[in-house]
Amino acid sequence: MDKKNKYNLLVALFLLLVGSFAVSCTKDDENTTDNTSTFAPISSEEALKIQNSLPGKYKGNVHVYDPSTKKNYYSNSRLDLDSLIIYKKKYNYGYLNLSRDTYVQLHNIEKTGINDTLPEIFTKRDEKANIELEGIRFTSRNQQDSCVYRFEVSRGKADFLDRSHNKPSVWYLRTYFNGYGYYNVKTSKFKIYLRPFNAYTMLFHETLEYGRIPLTGRYLVYELTKIQ
């Protein structure tokens, strides 16, 4: 094989590789953002590059999923509550919106009796709180779709206040979350799964825990797209 043919062959192989990568990175398929795909570890440099591209505002929807019944629960809130803001420089990495209505569904609180002791929590269903995210860490890339990356959520926290008691301090519900998710760098779409791992009722500004909130096994699923 002469030099010209070798050169043409190398060019053809290069274009084939580029084309296959482009095809793999043009998918906009929800199946690429589940946990059935195969993921390969990425370098810290690649993870940092993705992190630096994230700051901005995202909007979409959130629902509660119960793995024991395989049912989804959607909020009846009239407010536009489903958004995520990731900051470039801030003490808290980012904020996810969460409505009281969704929170009640998450913990299935109406069947636990907590609503008898903290009534205000359940009378203002349209009120919102923020899940404060401490950070997310990208760990791997989808081998079937190179646009999709998996990440871990280090920790999140949400508080809902209740001022219905005639006491100097207000009561509140607090839930801690961890979880994981997927991010498509081409479409700027997040899919985030947040699992409560601790929840309790407390008096504001007090460190003593006053009661545990039962964990139901349900978790939050956010599907969000970058808008700015």
Language model regions located:
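Acidic, glycine-anchored loop motifs typical of Ca2+
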Residues: 71, 75-81
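Generic short beta-strand segments
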Residues: 59-67, 152-159, 193-204
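Short, cysteine-centered beta-strand-loop-beta hairpins and adjacent loop/turn segments enriched
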Residues: 65-73, 101-116, 198-214
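Edge beta-strand at a domain terminus
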Residues: 35-43, 170-228
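Tryptophan-anchored aromatic micro-motifs
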Residues: 51-73
